[in-house]
Amino acid sequence: VDIQWGNHDVVWMGAAAGSTACIANVIRIAAKYGNLNILEDGYGINLVLLAKLAMECYADDPCTGFTVDYRQGDYDERDALLDEKIHKAIAIIQFKLEGHIIKLHPEFDMDDRLLLDKMDNDKGTVMVYGKEYPLRTTCFPTLDPKDPYALTEQEMDVVERLRGAFMNCEKLQRHIRFLYTKGSLYKVYNGNLLY
């Protein structure tokens, strides 16, 4: 068995190692594609605290732009409303966590990815590369305009609980160890570089 790691593999590796930004990314992708059951049923990761935050913060929000992209027959459509709220809640958490990393490491030269502080909820716009664009939604109850990258206390609780769940999930750790043992970013085979 030989595995070349892709973007998703690396994000899962980071999540298993306890990177909160990677954990948020893994959950966001799972929510977007209607695969939260992989986390809950497959790995036993409890998402109740996140679901509670999502339902409290976005109860009346249609979560425009956070729809679940699923295949017919593979997904219980009754889960869509909750999954969309989870998708939005974890996306905002992810943007905040990534913002912390970007600010902590200016050498990454990723300041252009910092957009939460460029949003104007009153006008319903965001400034990107000097041009103003309309927002699809202005419902961001967990964003503090004075410090948009600060996690709320409830978000911090969710993040810490999820971090512990990912780091202490033996099945996930076993799968990630397998990726480390049997995989790499590239392979040289028959004199050819494979990546």
Where on the chain are the PLM-derived regions?
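Feature recognizes metal-dependent phosphohydrolase scaffolds
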Residues: V1-Y195
